[in-house]
A protein has these predicted regions:
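Ribonuclease/tRNase effector modules and their secretory precursors
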Residues: 1-107
Length: 107
């Protein structure tokens, strides 16, 4: 479960978090701490909708492999559930390209 605070309405929403098997595999392969996707989702001030994949993306700068990097968390959500799909480092030019092309829309 995750607690989401909506700043504008002072509303608290509890949502179930599901890690896909693909995300769990990526966490193991990339040596990423298990709770990092939850941290990214909860702390990120950058959330996008990907018009190509139809998934949501959360971007957060975190320490990864000894460096400060932006990590992209791909997820789907509905009224009471967040399904976290994958996580990976993203380079600034990749993020900027997806935003400027209109592929990613800020939400």
């Amino acid at each position: 479960m995750i607690c989401i605070f909506q700043q504008s309405l002072l509303t608290i929403i509890f949502m179930e978090i599901i890690y896909t098997s693909h995300l769990e595999f990526r966490l193991r392969v990339r040596n990423i701490p298990y709770d990092l996707p939850r941290e990214i989702f909860g702390q990120s001030k950058e959330h996008y909708y990907d018009n190509l994949t139809r998934h949501h993306i959360a971007i957060q700068k975190m320490e990864f492999e000894g460096k400060l990097r932006e990590l992209a968390l791909t997820y789907d959500r509905d009224e009471n559930m967040i399904e976290m799909i994958t996580i990976h480092p993203i380079k600034p030019h990749q993020k900027n390209s997806r935003i400027s092309s209109g592929r990613w829309e800020r939400i």
